[in-house]
Amino acid sequence: MKKVVNIEKTDSNFENYTLFDIETTGLNRSKDFMYMFGICEKKDNELIYSQYYIEDEKEEKELILELSKLLNNKKIISYNGDRFDFPFIRKKMEKYNIPKFNFENTDIYRQLQKLNLFRRA
């Protein structure tokens, strides 16, 4: 597993939240695998962007374990996390017998859906 980190100064005010997203090889929770996840957290006056990724499906369990450790008891902001990311992760946790972790998720995709910005005429 590899990790890439970028840090930049900020005055934004989203303390105590973790921005989160995953990347997978496809949409099928049983056949495809997760090869990357990214998080962004604010610490003091810095935004810390971290990406965790694997190059081989055999490392997927290690990636899921790291994800569960980092996101446990966090307030998360995701985009379509309720419908895709977290169901995908839960399926993989079952596969690898990894215990569930606690988190609170705000899915901005669901919030945007309520605004009907994408409705067809």
What is the predicted function of each stretch?
Residues 10, 27-31, 117:
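Hydrophobic, well-ordered secondary-structure scaffolds
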Residues 22, 35, 79-81:
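Long, contiguous hydrophobic alpha-helical segments, chiefly transmembrane helices and signal peptides
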Residues 47-121:
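Conserved DEDDh/DEDDy metal-dependent 3′-5′ exonuclease domain
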Residues 16-25:
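Two-metal-ion RNase H-like nuclease active-site motif
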